[in-house]
Swiss-Prot record:
Cell compartments where the protein resides: Cytoplasm
Pathway recorded for this protein: Cofactor biosynthesis; ubiquinone biosynthesis
E.C. number: 4.1.3.40
Keyword Lyase (UniProt): yes
Pfam family, one: Chor_lyase
Catalytic reactions of this protein: chorismate = 4-hydroxybenzoate + pyruvate
PANTHER family according to UniProt: CHORISMATE PYRUVATE-LYASE
UniProt name for this protein: Probable chorismate pyruvate-lyase
Length: 171
């Protein structure tokens, strides 16, 4: 991607209470409070990440994501494709204010091909403020604001057609 305004994620429609209810087996996946990476690992033999973009961006590049994060001079952006048995299962976009990266959290800028969940869920001081559910046509998405040692980051995930979210019943 040459233009920093581009994203691997298409525009998503975030659901409200006025939208039809989410099917139970889909909602079970979307409201997962633990590591999505671990959950995916129950449905394949091999998970790997294809990093698409890792760089610092300014607040004006955040668009509507800015409403979910505090003001910062810059933000770490990481966009990846999560693969299960070499099939694309999920597009992930993580936005982290620079202040969240201080101290022990600076490892977040060096994850490379390590899934975000492997890092986040190995830390005792991880909390989740909320999960929003969204869609892009027939694909489901979720957005979570997480906190590491009280400092926020925003994670948006789009579940691709090959994802087990569409083919399995709840575990």
């Amino acid at each position: 991607m040459s233009d920093p305004k581009d994203s691997i994620l298409p525009p998503l429609k975030w659901l409200s209470d006025q939208d039809p209810p989410v099917p139970t087996h889909i909602k079970d996946w979307l409201m997962e409070l633990g590591s999505m990476t671990r959950r995916f690992e129950n449905h394949c033999t091999y998970i790997h990440i294809k990093p698409q973009r890792e760089c610092f961006i300014t607040r004006d590049k955040l668009k509507e994501e800015a409403a979910h994060l505090p003001k910062s001079t810059r933000y770490w952006l990481r966009e990846v494709i999560l693969m299960g048995d070499n099939q694309p299962w999920l597009l992930g976009r993580t936005v982290i204010p620079q202040e969240t990266l201080f101290e022990h959290n600076e490892a977040l800028i060096n994850l490379g091909d390590v899934p975000l969940g492997r890092y986040l869920f190995s830390i005792d001081k991880l909390t989740r403020d909320y999960i929003h559910i969204g869609r892009k046509d027939t694909l489901w998405a979720r957005r979570s604001r997480l906190r590491l040692t009280g400092k926020p980051l925003l994670l948006t995930e789009l579940f691709l057609a090959a994802s087990p979210l569409y083919t399995t019943n709840p575990i």
